[in-house]
């Protein structure tokens, strides 16, 4: 990096790797060193662990086997332990197994119970003290100092109009700072000696106050009385002091090492770093600063500045869990020692320690903790972006409903650290974000960003990583790094940042400059070409929608890209990379044999594996037999990658024009070519599973002999009752035949069964059919069947059978497609290719977008990409465009697009590609009539993605199904075969049309009128007219009963239609 100023993009999984390595190297040692010596009550036995000699054993199973058999890919932790009998001076030392720790794989994820999981980083308010000012109801500024502990607990210091200082211990209760300082161990003389304004402290010290702080015990009693809201006069005791320590001091006064560092820096203190608790000296210095603010001295804090935030990385979260597990282990060891002494047994270190606390703690953490999530594996991009997310939610953090707009907003300190674009939409906007490409987590949990230092003394370029707050003291040139590397004129002025302000200064005044055009953005935003021409809201949608793109059966590289595609594919783990030099011996669809350094390696390839979003993960060999390869070369492409580059969509011919209203309001018109030539065809793999239990009537049985089922439905079962691999199955077919034993009541026995029971005493048991069947929309090819048998075979460890079915899905009406600029739409019609508009060279258009979707959304990047893609397809070129190219010259993007179109029109003899009267547009023809359209139309080849929101997963209908027990109304949701809700506004719409009978049907027969819907079923079978309902529906009867529970009686009558007679009827 010296000299040329060149830099490489860091590995996208680096943050996860560094966090896990820090946990293994430092976190384990730190927590083990805190494990105390354990002694029994009589101090006869002493047990201790040795930190220096812990060992992590390499796992016995491979990652692939862990996924296949639903196991945890973990390493066993062994620690040396010593047990000393003090009476006989005997000593035993053993290396003991204390539990398993899930390991991180090469993609930065963990495999727990066969499921890929990832721990995302959490961003929290950093512990320390923060000063802010608010206006009270009289418009007077009120200054407060908030002390945040390492656990997230908060205490506030306030100064009132009379310059009296209070510590707020709860929402309603506050106490004098003198009382709190005295309760923490300071006397009045020490307080006055350690403050800058002793006269102010003396001014609000009354005789009553002097009595309260006369001794530490009095101060503790006063503090306890205020904190616990206790009436009367409590008496000082050790238990009272312990309760106060547990409820207040431990939760709100433990600063931690980061909090101690922040407190020392903010208040100019020199307290040692190992003193991590709040001291009276801290309180008094904080009060001094508060008095200074009252008199116009000192500065307030910006709570949303990144220097006041910290990242809880994977290392911190795993270390916390390890500490929790050791506390549980300590309690278990104490209990075992007491039990052994009581029963006069001689324990060994191995007998004292159990692996359950550590193993179960990590299993529950990965399974239940909000920051441990199932890895999203829709496509390779989704995997790497998931690991770089951060969240403000979770334990100790914010909630989506209480977070303010200021917390969610972009801050100048985010520059180069947090992406200003990539965040979730909806209630969590601004709370869940993505780290910028070059950001890294520093030693103190701060986010650091790299800059190049500009020095007059040396010609070389030095790269610095600066934490938030430090870069504010430098003039940072925000220009494009490639442009700044050129010869700079003496009088050149450049845009720069200084103390959160943007300035234009001379080049000689610049201290630092950014290193990369993508430095400010996340991976998702960095994949958008011409992002500078898009509105930020549309760029946000695009970076989210790229993560929803489905890997296609035949992937294709984008013509117009940004250059980050290769790195994204490389770090995703979708590719197979050569780890050494060598020669390819043999290639097949499922493996590559590779010889190097005198040994032959077999590299297995992923074949039709299911991701957790039901997409298909598949690897294809890219090398031929006998070819010599170098280290780092690509051996096989994965899903959605081509030649080692990310390939999420297809380059298709698009026209921006209205077409008979079929593309209004974000609808998209497509050609049947996309269906018949499998342009947007994708494979999806669904998993169906069933368990066999041991019931009270006996074990469930897997068999192919299922009574009362047509042979057609069980045609694909083998002799064991499990579907054959390779079978084609349709809706309703049995995948696994299973019978569950059940005892039937005697009254329902057949006569011959009763006779057998009476004469021979044979108990006749019948079985219920509980087969696994193909649900609606589940048709496809069975590609894999797994019978997982857990060790032990008890009823608590049931056997599990999993069936995987592959579906081939062409694009169809109702599917969602999107570009890379937030331009999304639903397929509305599939036209025959002869009816689609066609170009002057006879080619028909593939997609028709609505031009009205561009100006109001201000995502003009799609126009540049569209035209440049057309030029690239004609010239057979690929372009990689860095963002913000206008910094080279004015209108740089437009110039490069027009110059390439002009070159394409000349070189390929297609003059229509660039027409000077309307550059970028062309006259095209109506496929139905052959006549040209009145206006020239924008045509091009953008990169269009097919998203995972597919109509096959969403379309749903119900004729009959399950009803809720209380309301007797149909259930809700596609998964429960539920009904469509007719709400209040839908009723108004039907009333407006005057369709009284349809409305009555909706609210009675099709909803919750039990008798009426039974009659409908009968009349449908027999024929005839459907009778009108004679009484109130179930929901009305429910309302009457609920009112009765409130002691309100609703008198209601039913009026006859014929003679208007009133009939009283009990609801």
From Swiss-Prot:
InterPro entries: DNA-dir_RNA_pol_bsu_ext_1_sf, DNA-dir_RNA_pol_su2, DNA-dir_RNAP_su2_dom, DNA-dir_RNAP_su2_hyb_sf, RNA_pol_bsu_bac, RNA_pol_bsu_CS, RNA_pol_Rpb2_2, RNA_pol_Rpb2_2_sf
Regions crossing the membrane: none
Enzyme Commission number(s) of this protein: 2.7.7.6
GO molecular function: DNA binding; DNA-directed RNA polymerase activity; ribonucleoside binding
SUPFAM superfamilies in the record: beta and beta-prime subunits of DNA dependent RNA-polymerase (SSF64484)
One Pfam family linked to the record: RNA_pol_Rpb2_3
CC terms in the record's Gene Ontology section: chloroplast; DNA-directed RNA polymerase complex; mitochondrion
Reaction catalysis annotation: RNA(n) + a ribonucleoside 5'-triphosphate = RNA(n+1) + diphosphate
Superkingdom assignment: Eukaryota
Keyword Chloroplast in annotation: yes
Compartment annotation: Plastid, Chloroplast
Keywords of the record: Chloroplast, DNA-directed RNA polymerase, Nucleotidyltransferase, Plastid, Transcription, Transferase
GO biological process: DNA-templated transcription
Family label: Belongs to the RNA polymerase beta chain family.
Function: DNA-dependent RNA polymerase catalyzes the transcription of DNA into RNA using the four ribonucleoside triphosphates as substrates.
Subunit structure: In plastids the minimal PEP RNA polymerase catalytic core is composed of four subunits: alpha, beta, beta', and beta''. When a (nuclear-encoded) sigma factor is associated with the core the holoenzyme is formed, which can initiate transcription.
PANTHER family in the record: DNA-DIRECTED RNA POLYMERASE I SUBUNIT 2
Protein name (Swiss-Prot/TrEMBL): DNA-directed RNA polymerase subunit beta
Organism: Ipomoea purpurea
Organism taxonomic ancestry: Eukaryota, Viridiplantae, Streptophyta, Embryophyta, Tracheophyta
